[in-house]
Amino acid sequence: MIRAIVFDFNGVLVDDEHVHFELFREVLASLGVPLDEAAYLDRYLGFDDRGAFSAALIDAGRDAPPAFVDELIARKAARYAEVAEAGLKFFPSAAETLAGLAERYPVAICSGALRAEIEYALRRLKVRDRVHSITSAEDTERCKPDPEGYLIALDRLRANLPDLEPHQCLVIEDSLAGLEAARAAGMIAVGVTHTYRHDELERAGAAAVVGGLGAITPGWVAAKF
């Protein structure tokens, strides 16, 4: 029986995976490091900004000292803030699905995004008050596919549900690395075909795959799991 819901953020609620790719590519290009979208999806999508920049620099034969990576993260974050201010794009039914699930379950966010980006988007969606807790890039040392973020989210949900078990948490993910992280944490994961194909999400271990957030209602969750 499902007792809590954990949403990924980018690519699930906010339609900005392409924005992150373009900004990531822009910052790397200023260093003379090329990046195409296929490589981004295959290699870097599951990382938080720190992990993605570090891996990209190392893959290009460059050093990745923490202070320099911090500078790159700050540059990308500043550009993302400009884009967000101009108008974020949300997936259809994002607000309705989150709010509807929150009527029956505690809802958490677990993402490699920066906390300020998550908070801003949730306020724009007018659902910040429906979210129990947020686990962001600042809270973790290891990014997806490592389960650390989801285990932190579980621990925070236990503030209200002390006996909550991992298999009682339903994760909503768009990425292969995210599905791997959720499964490694012992949680059940649903894949949404916002970024990867149905068959790719199935092969990554999604317990169910849906074409959009509107399919994920409290009744669907109760009947399916």
Report the location of each language-model feature:
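Asp-based, Mg2+/Mn2+-dependent phosphohydrolase catalytic module
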Residues: 1-3, 99, 115, 119-225
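Short coil/turn residues that cap or connect secondary-structure elements
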Residues: 32, 48, 61-64, 109, ...
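N-terminal helical cap/lid subdomain that shapes the substrate entry/recognition surface
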Residues: 2-95, 103
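Residues at secondary-structure transition points
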Residues: 15-18, 40, 44-47, 67, ...
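Generic serine detector
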Residues: 30, 54, 93, 111, ...
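Residue-level detector of anion-binding/catalytic polar loops
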Residues: 34, 106-107, 188, 207
